[in-house]
Regions:
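Sequence signature of WD/YWTD-type beta-propeller architectures
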Residues: 31-34, 38-342
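N-terminal Sec-pathway targeting helices
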Residues: 9-30
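N-terminal intrinsically disordered, acidic low-complexity segments at the extreme N-terminus
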Residues: 1-6
Length: 342
């Protein structure tokens, strides 16, 4: 037995010496595959950004194309497809009154406001499929073959094939954001807004902060939120941009946001916050400010009081009235240049 083990050892050693280069290459390939597998399993694919979805999800993108909700004489005309660069033809893919656009794989998902349905269709608009009924007009998000959506104020999830419908919470959730393997959400409790988190099954609930704002977003390892206070002396609301760690620690004010902020329009990128607020003569304007609280910049004035701000790459899409006084989607660079109607 001992001699057999010695012979086996010698055989392995001799094979390694004779094929050292091949063995090292094979080990390197295996190592790369293992690393790729680990990284790949940790990457989440989102159908749209959280900031866009909390602004009606008017625009979603895939590759060099955008899909957006179009208006005709102030009424929703359907969902259209166009090139990001603004060149080439514009194609109508659906006449549906749909919002909260998500794109995952070769499918587009949205909420039909007329029928309160969650719809899935191919990117060319064909083969519509109803995934869920009694869906609220509120943000949906498609993440890794799951769709998160509201029925009333209750949060649910369902597979993209329409199976495994699961209720995640019975709380009256105001806002939610799926981040990796967790869901961050806000709800009202005793007149104050709580920010909490749970896992993707609705379990392991943890309160993060019990006096934060309704409007929040997770960016990197921080939670940003708007602290809204009523000034009794001046009879007006005051707004603060605040931040804290994802565990609720190190809460601090970043800056004041002056003026009548429309908190429902808040959108964000990795380094900036976007929002609409009142300016003089009862008009509104869309602004940006860096997440460190510096360089507030007015991007564009708008005629509509209620707005929705969507961002794709370096472009911002928003609602405004055209010369006839009808609501329409406009596109402008985030630096305020190249403003035009879609």
């Amino acid at each position: 037995m001992k001699e057999k083990l010695i012979n086996l050892k010698n055989t392995v050693v001799n094979f390694y010496k004779a094929n050292k280069k091949i063995v090292l290459i094979a080990l390197a390939v295996i190592l790369v595959l293992i690393i790729a597998l680990i990284i790949g399993t940790g990457k989440e694919e989102y159908g749209n950004t959280y900031g866009n979805l909390r602004n009606k999800g008017l625009v979603a993108s895939k590759g060099s194309q955008i899909y957006y909700v179009a208006f005709d004489e102030g009424n929703v005309d359907g969902i259209y497809k166009a090139n990001k660069n603004g060149k080439g033809k514009v194609e109508k893919i659906s006449s549906e009154y749909g919002y909260y656009l998500n794109i995952s794989g070769n499918y587009i998902y949205y909420v039909s406001e007329e029928n309160s349905q969650l719809i899935k269709s191919k990117l060319n608009g064909e083969k519509n499929q109803v995934i869920a009924e009694n869906v609220s007009s509120a943000p949906i998000v498609v993440v890794n073959n799951w769709i998160y959506y509201f029925e009333g104020t209750n949060l649910y999830k369902i597979k993209t094939n329409g199976k495994n419908r699961t209720q995640l919470s019975n709380k009256a959730i105001e806002n939610y954001q799926v981040v990796g393997k967790e869901i961050y959400y806000s709800y009202e409790s005793n007149g104050k807004y709580v920010i909490a988190k749970m896992n993707l099954s609705g379990r392991d609930i943890t309160k993060i902060d019990e006096e934060a704002g309704r409007e929040f977003f997770v960016n990197g390892n921080k939670i940003y939120f708007i602290n809204e206070k009523y000034d009794m002396e001046n009879y007006e609301y005051k707004y603060e941009l605040c931040k804290m760690k994802k565990n609720g620690k190190n809460k601090e004010k970043v800056c004041d946001i002056e003026g009548g902020l429309d908190t429902y329009t808040i959108n964000f990128t990795n380094d900036a916050l976007y929002y609409a607020k009142a300016v003089k003569d009862e008009k509104m304007a869309i602004y940006s400010i860096k997440l460190n609280g510096k360089d507030e910049t007015k991007i564009v004035e708008v005629s509509t009081y209620s707005n929705a701000i969507n961002i794709v790459d370096k472009f911002m899409y928003y609602l405004n009235e055209n010369e006839e006084g009808n609501v329409q989607v406009y596109r402008i660079r985030t630096n305020g240049q190249d403003n035009k109607a879609m």
